[in-house]
Amino acid sequence: MSDMSATHGVAQPWLASYPPAVDGTTPIVAKPVYALLDDTAAQHPGNDCVDFLDKHYSYAEIKRESDKVAKGLQQIGLKPGMRLGLFLPNCPYFVIFYHGALKAGACLVNFNPLYAEPEIERQIADAEVDFMVTLDVSQLLPKLDAVLTKSRVKSVIVCPMAQQLPFPKNLVYPFVMRSVHARMRIDSRHIAYKDLVHNDGAYAPVEIDPATTVALLQYTGGTTGVPKGAMLSHANVYINAIQSKRWFYTVDSPQAKTIGVLPLFHAFAMTCVMNWTLAVGGCMILEPKFDTLKLLRLVHRKRPTALVGVPTLFNALLNFPQFKDYDLSSLVFAISGGAPLPVEIRKKFEEE
C-alpha cells in the first residue's frame, strides 16, 4: 500500500501500518448522514435494521418512519439549522428521529438520559434547542416537563414506549409497568408521536452541503469542565461511518449483527453501533441499558457478529461467575473504545 495520499500526494506514513485488507487511500465521497439509512433501505428493504427487545424493524420500516418524522417536523415549524434534542435511551425512536430530523434539515443535539434537570436546562440553553424528543417514561418525561416552562423549547414530541414493544408486551405494558409510565400533558407544547407522523412522508428535501452543514452538536463528557458542544458536519459523521466500514471488513455484509448496549447518544456508539451497522446493511440489536447477565444471554441467543464495548464492559463480562456458560463464538470481532483497553483484558477475552 502506498504511503502517499491518492488525492493530494501528501505523505501519509501511517498507511504502512494498516492491515493489507484496509483501504486507506480511495477517497470517500461525502453524503448527508441519512444516506447511510436510505442507501441501504434501497438495496435491502426487507432486511432487519433494528431488533429491540425481540421486535424487529426492517430497513423499509425505519426509512418510512424517518420520512414521516421529517415531514412532521417541517409541518410543526422546524426550519433548516434549527436544533432538535434527542432525550432518548437506545431504542428504535433514536434511529428514526436521528435520521428523520436530519432529512428535515435539523441540527441534532444528543442528551444523556441520566441528566438531572439543571443539566438538561443548561444544555437546552447552550445549544439553543427548539424541539425535544423523549419517551413517555417516568425517568425522562417528568424531568423534561420540569424545565420546559423555563426553556426556549417550542415543542416536545412524546413517543410511546409500548408501541415499540413486541406483542403481547405492547398490550400489557401500560398495566404491568404502570410505575414507570408517564402521562403526556395535553397542551400546545406537547405533540404525540402518532400525530407527528400522521402524514405521507413526502417531506420537502433540504439542500445540504456535507462539508459545511452541521449535522449535530455532540456534547463532550464534561470530565475536564462543563460539557461543550462539538460541531460535527454531515461529512464528519458520514465519512467516519464509511471509515469504520473499511476497518471492520471482516463483518462488512448485510449479515452483520451488532450488539448495541453502549448509549447511542455517545459519539462512539453512534458511529460504531448505529451508523456503521447502517453502512454495511446489518442489524443493530439495541438494549436500553447494560446488564452483564442480560448481555451474555443476548449474545448467546441472538448470535451477533460484533460487540462494541468499553474496558469496563469487557472486564465485567470476564469477571462474571458464569461467563463460560455462555456461547460467544458467533462474535467475529469485538471493539473497545472510550479508554485504553488493558492488554491483559484483551488477551483474556480473546482466549476465553
Regions found by a protein language model. Name each.
Residues M82-R83, P89-V109, P113-E117, A125-F131, ...:
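A short helix-loop-beta submotif of the ANL/AMP-binding
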Residues L73-L78, M82, D200-T213, L217-G260, ...:
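Conserved adenylate-forming
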Residues T134-L144, A162-Q164, L262, F290, ...:
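Adenylate-forming
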Residues Y238-K257, F265-A306, F320:
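Conserved AMP-binding/adenylation subdomain of ANL enzymes
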Residues I76, K103-D195:
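Structural core segment of the AMP-binding/adenylate-forming
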Residues M1-A30:
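Flexible, non-catalytic linker and terminal segments flanking ANL/adenylate-forming cores
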Residues V22-K31, L144, Y173-V214:
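Flexible, low-complexity linker/hinge segments
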Residues P27-V29, D38, G46-C91, V95-H99, ...:
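Conserved AMP-binding/adenylate-forming core of the ANL superfamily
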